[in-house]
């Protein structure tokens, strides 16, 4: 397992199994506009976050991936094929939906904010994850890699990866924590039905962190033949940039749709954050628009005061996990702590380095809501809008209870409805069954 390390000095040593890696922390940019204009740096840094903390055996593969992505984005044939498949296979563009009854629920005497949903739950496979999986599968084909591995927590990234592998005839192995397999049995069956091998991970807490560690071990062993489709804006460079750029279609569409719907930019963007891919996909095209507030909502689990949570930005400290420097949940010795969330997709003790950076420079805000708040929000949205959101997405909806009373009348709020809740029905039934 890659260890988390507390940083109290300007030089860091990360110990991988038998592989010492050193890195000097870069200084922070002074100018706020400069700080957001070029992300990441040529070294894969978002300020002091990001980088490549991996065994030497992976460095050529990361360099190959970075070069392949750079060339692909400049190739009209690649972008045309990606756009074609996003339309015809994934079902993009996803609509921007005015949630009239949810808006009315939070209405005050002066009118209150207006709430819009970016409907990523309507994508093929039921979540935003297919955007990145499709893009990386096309890159793997360009690199001649025929074997694909992935990690998954809630199972949505695993399903998306298995889906694109079936589409292109690629071998697929998905690593998934045994506890998450129990919680997400439907998605496990979907992956196997699509022809993927689902490899249970029983180490540690048997959740997303441990699945990611096992996927990295596989990649180290089989790097010549295998491409790792990492599912979030985490991991070593170029993954945080690569995954962000494939998901940026979310924010690009939302920007145009807002102009068509109400004639200007939104005032607030709201999204759940585990590793942070759906949030970054929505945020990225708006980062340089200072009038747009960007709010990420983490999982407070049983409450941040209990220690049983996954509120990494809210409660974390700087360290290294899974090849990148970011904020992590750690103990006093720098060991990565167990995370907890009712949502398997948010049950992760780290976060993408760009989120850590945007928080540090004050460009984005981050909050946390509990399991119970997420359940209450899931039920509310289901009853008011006829849309059952994923438990991950429900965390973003839950923050409306705190946010809406603070917003001026006429404020336009866009929530990334990142996934549908079919996969969570059993979990929700266990928690709410006696209340329905």
Curated annotation (Swiss-Prot):
Keyword set, alphabetical order: Amino-acid biosynthesis, Aromatic amino acid biosynthesis, Lyase, Pyridoxal phosphate, Tryptophan biosynthesis
Enzyme class name: lyase
InterPro entries in UniProt: Trp_synth_b_CS, Trp_synth_beta, Trp_synth_beta/beta-like, TrpB-like_PALP, TrpB-like_PALP_sf
Cofactor entry: pyridoxal 5'-phosphate
Alphabetized Pfam families for the sequence: PALP (PF00291)
Record-level GO cellular component terms: cytoplasm
MF (Gene Ontology): tryptophan synthase activity
N6-(pyridoxal phosphate)lysine: residues carrying this PTM: 129
Keyword Lyase: yes
Its EC number(s): 4.2.1.20
Reaction catalyzed: (1S,2R)-1-C-(indol-3-yl)glycerol 3-phosphate + L-serine = D-glyceraldehyde 3-phosphate + L-tryptophan + H2O
Pathway: Amino-acid biosynthesis; L-tryptophan biosynthesis; L-tryptophan from chorismate: step 5/5
Subunit structure: Tetramer of two alpha and two beta chains.
The family this protein is said to belong to: Belongs to the TrpB family.
Biological role: The beta subunit is responsible for the synthesis of L-tryptophan from indole and L-serine.
Record protein name field: Tryptophan synthase beta chain
């Amino acid at each position: 397992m890659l260890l988390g390390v507390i940083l109290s000095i300007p030089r860091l040593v990360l110990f991988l199994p038998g592989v010492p890696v050193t890195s000097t922390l870069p200084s922070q940019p002074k100018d706020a506009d400069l700080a957001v204009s070029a992300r990441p740096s040529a070294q894969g840094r978002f300020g002091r976050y990001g980088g490549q903390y991996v065994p030497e055996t992976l460095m050529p593969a990361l360099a190959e991936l970075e070069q392949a992505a750079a060339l692909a984005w400049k190739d009209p044939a690649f972008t045309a094929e990606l756009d074609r498949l996003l339309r015809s296979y994934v079902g993009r563009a996803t609509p921007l939906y005015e949630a009239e009854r949810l808006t009315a629920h939070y209405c005050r005497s002066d009118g209150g904010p207006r709430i819009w949903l970016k409907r990523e739950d309507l994508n093929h496979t039921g979540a935003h994850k297919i955007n990145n999986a499709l893009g990386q599968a096309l890159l793997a084909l360009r690199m001649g890699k025929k074997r694909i591995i992935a990690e998954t927590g809630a199972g949505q990234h695993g399903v998306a990866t298995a889906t694109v592998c079936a589409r292109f005839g690629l071998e697929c192995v998905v690593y998934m924590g045994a506890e998450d397999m129990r919680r997400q049995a439907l998605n496990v069956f979907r992956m196997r039905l699509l022809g993927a091998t689902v490899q249970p991970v029983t180490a540690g807490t048997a959740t997303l962190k441990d699945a990611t560690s096992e996927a990295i071990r596989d990649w180290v062993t089989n790097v010549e033949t295998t491409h790792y489709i990492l599912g979030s804006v985490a991991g070593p460079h170029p993954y945080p940039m690569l995954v962000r750029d494939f998901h940026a279609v979310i924010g690009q569409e939302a920007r145009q749709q807002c102009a068509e719907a109400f004639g200007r930019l939104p005032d607030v963007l709201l999204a759940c954050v585990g590793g942070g891919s759906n949030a970054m996909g929505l945020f990225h095209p708006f980062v340089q628009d200072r009038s747009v507030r960007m709010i990420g909502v983490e999982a407070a689990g049983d409450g941040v005061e209990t220690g049983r949570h996954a509120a990494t930005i809210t409660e974390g400290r700087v360290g290294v996990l899974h090849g990148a420097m970011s904020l992590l949940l750690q103990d006093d010795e720098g060991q990565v702590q167990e995370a907890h969330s009712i949502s398997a997709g948010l049950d992760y003790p780290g976060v993408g380095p760009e989120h850590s950076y945007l928080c540090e420079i004050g460009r984005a805000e981050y909050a946390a809501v509990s399991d119970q708040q997420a359940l209450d929000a899931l039920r509310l949205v289901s009853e008011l809008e006829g849309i059952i959101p994923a438990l991950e997405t429900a965390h973003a909806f839950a923050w409306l209870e705190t946010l809406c009373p603070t917003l001026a009348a006429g404020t336009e709020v866009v929530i990334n409805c990142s996934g549908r809740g079919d996969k969570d029905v059993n979990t929700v039934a266990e928690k709410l069954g006696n209340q329905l």
